[in-house]
């Protein structure tokens, strides 16, 4: 029912809509950027400020009429809400705007971005699982919208209610996807155990999407992974053996993983448990922060990252990397470092530029100090990749 043809939606016209509530930060520009990044032509961004959401449409009825005028005038095919919408509101909006107009919320937009970025079997399975779980309750409204809630003989089977049939089929598919992901997770656990046996500490890169993690990974591991393609360029984990200094004790496995995003729905976070598990099981976490962001945004995201690390039971040591200092002046760097240290009390915070290499020596030395107490029982193969500009211990 909800199968999406992403390729057919290239350059589809869309409108971004936000109901700006007092307690929520604006997501309008974030949604516009994500939508345009995966091929939508965003013709308008509409924002309505309200004390609370409307029970039928989230936005008020008058704003819905204004939205319909924009949709009709511009032949808009998709309406993207920055808010999280219950299924009943989605389908009431679709009824009012026209049956051919898709209405999605921020969570489904995120999943579309994921879908576009997915490169591995695991990522694709996780996306399918998240989408099925998130839209499971939508089946009844979807069927209502098309007026087929009674018994019917046809594709749903004789003598059964369509929703019940859909629900059973969806639950069965969810079970199969979960079983496949558990199998992949077991294989990852075996690989982690193998790394432990060889004595390689695991260093995981974590942080918000587009904070420079993959740029750092490419620089250190001499890789050419895609960067700068918008949110969620990395959806699966990538691991390489690297050395951050001259001694054998600086050898480790460097892991690049999926980027965080603020207020991600728990269903989506849970679907990516296996991927986030690489962060949770690492010996050291390099937590990347984009120092070029505004200080209030950085402060809010630091609190959010702290929460995510707690939710996934990450118990490794943490070094916060205030990245992209090449884009800001020294005064802003000082302000950013103060904001980070207030929210990561007792944690090392190091300003760097993964792009230019500025201050990477200090970071490499800190990494080496943190991982040197993990005993190495086997040397790194002769084909190991050495980090550029390795720090030589004094």
Residue ranges and their predicted role:
Residues 1-112:
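N-terminal accessory targeting/assembly segments
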Residues 1-16, 32, 133-211, 217-218, ...:
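C-terminal-of-GTPase-core extension/linker across diverse P-loop GTPases
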Residues 2, 198, 220-252, 264-274, ...:
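Switch I (effector-binding) loop of TRAFAC-class P-loop GTPase G-domains
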Residues 20-22, 53-56, 117, 121, ...:
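Flexible beta-alpha connector loops of hexameric P-loop NTPases
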Residues 20-23, 50-52, 84-87, 108-112, ...:
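Conserved nucleotide-binding/hydrolysis micro-motifs of P-loop NTPases
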Residues 28-36, 68-73, 80, 84-98, ...:
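Conserved C-terminal guanine-recognition region of P-loop GTPase G domains, centered on the G4
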Residues 107-127:
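Short alpha-helix plus adjacent loop in nuclease-associated cores
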Residues 112-117, 236, 360-362:
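Short, charged, surface-exposed secondary-structure boundary motifs
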